[in-house]
């Protein structure tokens, strides 16, 4: 993370991947250093396109912003998960083949494997332009 460059700008776009329902500690540290900045957040999350879940994530991530920073806007989309996650889900399902939740987790991993897509990225770019430039 290049915090010095970010701190020199008036508006900062910060990208992150969802880590246990929030952002990584390094992103949290960057956000806490962005005093007086307008901040646009964009991120990926392994679990589906649920706007209410995305809002919960953004609320948790935003709680790391410096007190005098302004959230200019945000965008989230589904993101891929690593192969170790798939292996864990497969092992869980092997132990309990009738478990609907485990099946849903594995199905979601498959659905997420090609994300973010070009459409996801285009939507994020459009949201950033609208929030930052008013376009």
Regions found by a protein language model. Give the residues of each.
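FMN-binding flavodoxin-like domain, especially the glycine-rich phosphate-binding loop
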Residues: 9-14, 19-135
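A short, well-structured beta->alpha microelement
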Residues: 1-5
